[in-house]
Amino acid sequence: MDQNGVNEGTGHKSVDLIQIMDKWQKKWTEAKIFEAEHDLRDKFFITAAFPYLNGVLHAGHLRTFTIPETIARYQRMKNKNVLWTFGFHVTGTPILGLANQIKDRKEDIIWAYNNLHNIPMDELLKLKTPEAIVECFSKKATEAFKRMGFSLDWRRNFKTDDKVFSKFIEWQFYKLKEMGHITKGSHPVRYCPKCENPVEDHDLLHGEESTTVEYSLIKFTSEFDGKEIIMPMATLRPETLFGVTNAWVNPNEIYVMAKVHDEIQKLDGEDVELKYNGIWIVGKECADKLKEQDRKIEILKEIKGNELLGLKIKNPVTKKEVPLLPADFVEMGIGTGWVMSVPAHAPYDYVALRDLGKIEEVGLIPLIEIEGYDKYPAKEIVEKLGVKDQNDDELLEQATSKIYKDEFHKGKLNENCGEYAGISVKDIKEKLTKDYLNSNIAEIMYEFSEQKVVCRCGEKCIIKTVKGQWFINYSDENWKKLAHECIDNMNFAPENIRQEFHNKVDWMKDKACARKKGLGTILPFDENWIIESLSDSTIYMAYYTIARFINEGLTPEQLIPELFEYVYLGNGNVEEITKNSNISKETIEEMRKEFLYYYPLDWRCSAKDLIPNHLTFMIFNHVALFGREHWPRGIEINGYVTIEGKKLSKSKGPVLPVSEVAENFGADVARFYITTCAELPQDADVKFKEMEKARDNLIKLYELAVSVMEEEKTEKELSLIDKWLLHKTYSSINGAETAYEEFQLRKIGLMFYELINDLRWYKRRGGENNNVLKEVVEIWTKLLSPVTPHLCEEIWEKLGYAGFISQELYPEIKLEMVNEDLELGEEFIKSAMEDIRNINGVAKINPEKMYLYTADDWKYDLLEFMNENSEKNVKALIPMVMKEDKFKRHGKEVMKLINEIMKIGVKKAIAEVEILENAKTFIESEFDCEVIVNGEDVKGKKKFAIPYKPAIYME
């Protein structure tokens, strides 16, 4: 077992999956069967979020990429002209940071890339530049895709640092600026002090899901050390200011007294003016944060927290003075080092005051009325839950969460809130914050939603107000309306993810789109900046449509903005563009046709981590740049991947490189397992023992194909069990089609395992018709080929067919082969045999005779009646049944039977006597006794028979 937990040597003695994989990958490459160009067929365009190349492709990539790969192959079988291709994301700072870490021989990085990413040490130590890393991992990613048998059009591949791709991005940014979507200003951004750059999600080692939270700093005042001072309190709920009874200070921590000046940015450039804002006392960490957020901080002195105890501070709204009290729970890493205390509504504050014995002294001030609570909600819920003291964290969290949720959704401000009385809590924050800011009793401070936010370089990130920064104004309400419209008209898999996209659009704020360092496209209208990696990856799907033309040898100089303007928007004069670009008119027109043919994008596939960034940005940029007819049509989201219960980690492991999985298990086993082991939104846990089982079952299909070809073809009349197997197989065609169309690939796996069980049952029931088995294998080879293409190509060839199964059409259902009665009949036999075994197990006898009794006719009549009224529940059904004379005379037995049938399931009536007679020999062989169907009613057992559940007597 290696560092990633993979067992080596998992081949199978009868089938060499690696050899089969090699064979068909070579044939596909030589035949170029996956290269796509516009023609007269219906098109299908699917993409996945391209991988970032700061490591090898891992198990998470495998799942995310194999889903669209499978769908692409399925859509080809539906005679669609499928465009499915890939690019590589390399821009930004992570690759630059990795190069520096390798150059510095950072031990943990060297270990991880040598042992987890499987980079030989001599090769690894050469990766000292971003260019070397890009070259290394682009080759490895390409090889991984090919080893997995992905059906990609490689002519369209590109990297985001390609100069030709940069020309496309330049055009995009010119357009966005022209539309007013890009502005320059001063905004708070997530920032790395070491890299001297704003950082995005992909730049982070920890805290990828952190957001920037806006706190209100309420300016309480006091006198200390002979000076008038401001003691700002950070809060997310400014309405609670009306209920403050005291404030908390951590007596064991260091605070600072400092002169504060606001930095006011001048209209032009990045220069600022300073405006005096008083003397503040805040926590030492807070002072460092404020320096980065438009304030100049001049430290006057340090103060121990216990020196401030007993100080009276004035509430700027109520004008009341409240005391500072000690609390060890005050965290200096969040806010200002002070915490307002609102004990009537905050369980933590109430319990802390109770522990100090200060409740009577400071009192409780109610400010929110909530239906279902008394005057003091915090006191009520603390007593109800039995919270003992401040250390009872679990109950305190429960209490806080409950009250805050109820206050937000059901609470209204009371008379203690003056002019704001009667306003609901959920509507008050924005108004109050605005009023407080205008009255100069509050300011804004920004914090992370998570405390641990670390850049990939290892530096702790801060929130910094960057001046002269370029932003994309995603906060624009009109732009958001278009994004919502797009989302409303898109398909989503799973469907319930739609609302999350709406939420992300609502929450979207202006976003820094450029930085000073890293790989990427120079901002065309300000060469001091480089476009960052979450902004150059929003519409590249459109680039795929014309990439094959560009990759044939067009130069960056030829890719003028007017070319993209014409190809994507139809604007401009082709002759003029030809003249200025030196690209032939024919090529330009072909590029335009290719774009118009393949756009819009039918499906975009990704893991759920890209919802708040890449995917939402894709929607925004498409609705800004393209007409409605070219807006994206669908997004598929899958869960994450773990390895034997362990979370993937590029630095600590496991990683499970894609190429390693392919070599150890074979591409088909990996593809089958990763797409079918979990439902789409669920996280998939890779278990190697289960992968081995999947491999063994796939090989059974191959071995069956070989065996049916080795036996001579003979014409036989179809038996009932033959017809049953054909029914099951042809029924699978529609089931698999629905699964593929709806991205429910786990169902394909479940259907395949059902096939394996069906084949076992068929053999057990005496099935031996080679023609039937060949037909079953042919159909299932087609159904499985999108998931396991190499093995299916091999089986297809073994069955004697020429050409590629990858180019075959989806199988058509033969309605004459579908008969639900056959399936119900076999399930009836299985159920009866299970009942026989259960009776045998209890009675512990070896019967010589077995009597099987089917139900009386009136019971089947009742079943038919229930089928005709299947929408009715038991309560509604019984009065209807009892109106019928043929049922009424059976009295209480009817009601009992209705419940029993409901328990079994209301199914259509079948010819149970005929089915049992047909299966009699089989049942006799299974239990080694004589079977009598509806013979002498021994000991009155027949009356216990109900539809689908024969009565049984043994002797």
UniProtKB/Swiss-Prot annotation:
The keyword Transmembrane does not apply. ATP binds at K650. GO terms for molecular function: aminoacyl-tRNA deacylase activity; ATP binding; leucine-tRNA ligase activity. A motif ('HIGH' region) lies at residues 51-61. GO terms for cellular component: cytoplasm. InterPro entries: aa-tRNA-synth_I_CS, aa-tRNA-synth_Ia, Leu-tRNA-lgase_arc, Leu-tRNA-synth_Ia_arc/euk, M/V/L/I-tRNA-synth_anticd-bd, Rossmann-like_a/b/a_fold, tRNAsynth_Ia_anticodon-bd, Val/Leu/Ile-tRNA-synth_edit. The keyword Heme does not apply. A motif ('KMSKS' region) lies at residues 647-651. Keywords: Aminoacyl-tRNA synthetase, ATP-binding, Cytoplasm, Ligase, Nucleotide-binding, Protein biosynthesis. It catalyses: tRNA(Leu) + L-leucine + ATP = L-leucyl-tRNA(Leu) + AMP + diphosphate. Belongs to the class-I aminoacyl-tRNA synthetase family. This is Leucine--tRNA ligase.
